[in-house]
C-alpha cells in the first residue's frame, strides 16, 4: 500500500512535487489549483508557496465531498470564480472518484477543468475512468507490477 499523504508531508519530497505540478500549471495556463480534501491539501499549499516564490499568479481551492451543513455551506473553499481555469490535484489515483468529484464540483461552479494530475497513479483503473469522463490525466509516478515508475 502506498500512502501518498506521507510523501507530501516531507518537506524535501513536497518541494519536488510542487515544482513538477507548478510546471503543469504553467503549461496548462491554470490559475487555480484545486483538489479533494485531505490528500490534496498539503500539495496545494506547497505549490502555492512555489508559485509565490516565482511571482506566478495562482490561487488554491479545497473541495469537500459535499457542501457543509453549517457555516457558509460551501463545498469549495477558496477564492474561485466561474471564469477560472482549474487544475485538479490529488496525492494518489486509485478509482478516480475523488478527483472526478472535485472536477465536477468546480465545473458546477462554472469553472473549466484544464486537467487532472496525481502524484501516484496506482494503475487500478482511475486513469481510464478520468479519461473516459473527458479529462486529461497525468501523474508524477505510476505503480507498475507493484513498483513505482517515475514521471509518467
Put a short name on every predicted segment:
Residues 28-39, 117:
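Short glycine-rich phosphate-binding loop at a beta-alpha junction
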Residues 104-152:
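PRPP-dependent phosphoribosyltransferase catalytic core
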Residues 28, 42-58, 128-145:
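Short acidic, glycine/proline-enriched helix-loop-strand junctions
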Residues 43-87, 94-101:
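Short, glycine/charge-rich flexible loops or terminal/linker lids adjacent to PRPP-binding catalytic cores
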Residues 1-29:
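Active-site-facing substrate-recognition patch
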Residues 68, 93-95, 119-125:
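Short Gly/Pro-enriched loop/turn and capping motifs at secondary-structure junctions
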Residues 26-31, 81-84:
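Short helix-loop-beta connector
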